[in-house]
């Protein structure tokens, strides 16, 4: 059926919606970040010190006397400023391919654009998490999770030590905690009897955004954004924030009779708010 005048605008709106839905389904790490909006190029945020506050001076929190002054407690934060980053990609489709190809070129182009942007953002999120210095620890696994000697494999111990380290820094990893693993380490976990026979282990009823199940109170999220020989524990909606300056947007640039460019972009930044709610396990692979 021939296109009518103005139909390209309708198609553009439809494609923009499709791209946004695709992106929401493909993200693995960004859904774990608290999302806030921004209308400035540079944003300032504050990293919080999680230390439990104690009274300063001669007064104590416990046992305040009649008509006595209250003790003073002071929370501290570190100020950080950074600029938003733009992520984007486009795909050129000839008029002939768009109209006459044996498969849906437009659909495959949209899928490729979305994957490239989502992958880039998720990789940037993981890089920001690993770059944070003041975490609850970066500790080598007792033995690789795929150790050739099966009896040496003990990922449950490594995971529990991570939970312990975060507890000791006043973050309860079992309230919204997430275990981030790459596909290799996920396979190692699923083949480990100490994991799958642990009373806390269960598979996900519905697999979405990389969520594969639970162990030790943590949600297991599988993603290629996690680098080799490494796993990480964070807390969903607490550890970090995704500050969005421009949400996922899409435009069609049409040259009638020649080609159509599908262009998508997003702009934002990752902000690590609670660095002590990060724990990294290294040496997970032999």
What are these regions (language model features)?
Residues 14-87:
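Assembly/oligomerization interface modules of large self-assembling protein complexes
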Residues 135-206:
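Extended, solvent-exposed, turn-rich assembly/linker loops in the middle of proteins
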Residues 2-12, 24, 39-51, 78, ...:
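Sequence/fold signature of self-assembling virion shell proteins
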Residues 127, 137-143, 153-157, 267-268, ...:
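Cell-envelope/extracellular anchoring and linker segments
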Residues 75-136, 171-172, 179, 220, ...:
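Long, contiguous amphipathic alpha-helices that act as assembly "spine/axial" helices in icosahedral shell
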Residues 8-12, 22-26, 144, 148-155:
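Intrinsic-disorder-associated interaction segments
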Residues 55, 101-102, 188-191, 271-273:
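Short helix/loop capping segments that flank catalytic or ligand/cofactor-binding pockets
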């Amino acid at each position: 059926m021939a296109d009518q005048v103005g139909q390209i605008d309708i198609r553009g709106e439809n494609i923009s919606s499709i791209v946004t839905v695709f992106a929401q389904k493909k993200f693995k790490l960004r859904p774990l970040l608290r999302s806030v909006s921004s209308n400035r190029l540079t944003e300032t945020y504050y990293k919080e010190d999680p230390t439990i506050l104690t009274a300063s001076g001669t007064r104590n929190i416990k046992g305040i006397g009649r008509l006595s002054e209250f003790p003073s407690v002071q929370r501290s934060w570190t100020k950080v400023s950074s600029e938003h980053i733009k992520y984007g990609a486009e795909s050129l489709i000839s008029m002939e391919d768009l109209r006459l190809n044996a498969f849906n070129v437009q659909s495959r182009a949209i899928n490729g654009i979305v994957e490239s942007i989502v992958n880039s953002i998720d990789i940037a999120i993981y890089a920001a998490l690993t770059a944070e210095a003041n975490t609850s620890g970066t500790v080598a696994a007792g033995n690789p999770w795929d150790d050739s000697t099966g009896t040496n494999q003990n990922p449950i111990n490594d995971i529990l030590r991570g939970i312990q380290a975060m507890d000791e820094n006043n973050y309860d990893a079992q309230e919204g905690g997430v275990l981030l693993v790459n596909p290799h380490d996920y396979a190692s976990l699923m083949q480990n009897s100490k994991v799958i026979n642990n009373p806390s282990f269960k598979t996900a009823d519905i697999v979405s955004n990389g969520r594969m199940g639970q162990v030790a109170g943590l949600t297991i999220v599988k993603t290629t954004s996690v680098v080799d020989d490494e796993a990480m524990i964070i807390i969903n909606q607490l550890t970090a924030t995704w500050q969005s300056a421009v949400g996922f947007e899409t435009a069609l640039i049409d040259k009638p009779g020649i080609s159509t460019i599908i262009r998508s972009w997003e702009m934002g930044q990752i902000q690590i708010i609670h660095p002590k709610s990060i724990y990294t396990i290294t040496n997970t692979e032999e």
